[in-house]
From Swiss-Prot:
The keyword Nucleotide-binding applies. It comes from Pseudoalteromonas atlantica (strain T6c / ATCC BAA-1087). ATP binds at P121, T122, G123, S124, G125, K126, T127, L128. GO terms for molecular function: ATP binding; ATP hydrolysis activity; ATP-dependent protein folding chaperone; protein dimerization activity; unfolded protein binding; zinc ion binding. PROSITE patterns: CLPX_ZB. Gene3D superfamilies: 1.10.8.60, ClpX chaperone, C4-type zinc finger domain (6.20.220.10), P-loop containing nucleotide triphosphate hydrolases (3.40.50.300). One of its GO terms (biological process) is proteolysis involved in protein catabolic process. This is ATP-dependent Clp protease ATP-binding subunit ClpX.
Amino acid sequence: MSDKQSGDGDNKLLYCSFCGKSQHEVRKLIAGPSVFVCDECVELCNDIIREEIKEIAPKQKQDELPTPKEIHSHLDDYVIGQEHAKKVLSVAVYNHYKRLRNGDVHDGVELGKSNILLMGPTGSGKTLLAETLARLLDVPFTMADATTLTEAGYVGEDVENIIQKLLQKCDYDVEKAQRGIVYIDEIDKISRKSDNPSITRDVSGEGVQQALLKLIEGTIASVPPQGGRKHPQQEFLQVDTSKILFICGGAFAGLDKVIEQRAHTGTGIGFGTAIKDSSNKSKEGELLKKVEPEDLVKYGLIPEFIGRLPVLTSLEELSEEALIQILREPKNSLTKQYAALFSLEDTELEFREDALQAIAKKAMSRKTGARGLRSIVEAVLLDTMYELPSMSNVSKVVVDETVIRGESKPILIYDSAADKKSISE
């Protein structure tokens, strides 16, 4: 639509070339070569494109869902050991996204949601498994700490803030958020303080479990856009949490004793009594594999909450050999990460085998699992990383067992000299 003259002189009233509205009827008019488009038409075009993408995207992604074997294989690249947990997760995640892509109801049968509960000691790989799954599937991922959550109306973090964080990860794209994965850590810390409900309010225990129930099962969560504070006049984003996969994790210290106690209940006195031999007690990891919902109720989780987490799996405590593998084998292993950092300074970093063994031993003694490996390596290499950028001609840094034990400094090998020097020289 050509410009129309309004009044005398150079005053021209401009019109949108698409809808015909004047510049006074719209908020903004964008100019192009001899044409104009208003903000309302731009928004309308965006809506049309979004709707078309929604129709095309599911068809494109139908063939992209990896099989359980492919998911397991990808997890193998980043997570050492935990074969049973990886198999359980691969199947549960595959079924969840198959359900999303084919609808909740198939041939008249409603497909239930497969949220997951991971049990295992600190540093056994619970968080890494969840992160790796999200990265493989290219879906938004967020973590929450159950210990910071409280019931609505109390000081602390509201459970709906979890969905807020997920939206932030995908620029408040609701469709993307609804395909996301939420990992809630330290879930064992919100267990009820005793088997009997207390008269007093337990705002960080059973109360949080009650608050999480609907969120995990599936509800329409109202979240303020762009992180704004809630107020009555504000439009909320509506997020359907029934499409979000929730993975809850915790160490569940002492749960093995609950399982063991159940295994020995019902035994009588006399000849039929099973003798409890401490030398024949199963390891904690083996006991966790035998967990039943009733054990989790005894531990302090309410039955309704356990019912929303139908997939239960446990992770074993990592052995010294597994920790050495973690240091060396995964695609993003610690030794490879630090070697890449040193390569940016044109320096090669070498960890000798006895150094890896010493790091694993130290992590085992600290009982921090794989999580403690980085802090050990960081402390060992701190002085070297501080000095190296100011030094020249260092071609290689070697770390051996004595360095890990604090008896010596890393060995520096120079280009210009055949001799070796330590960082302290």
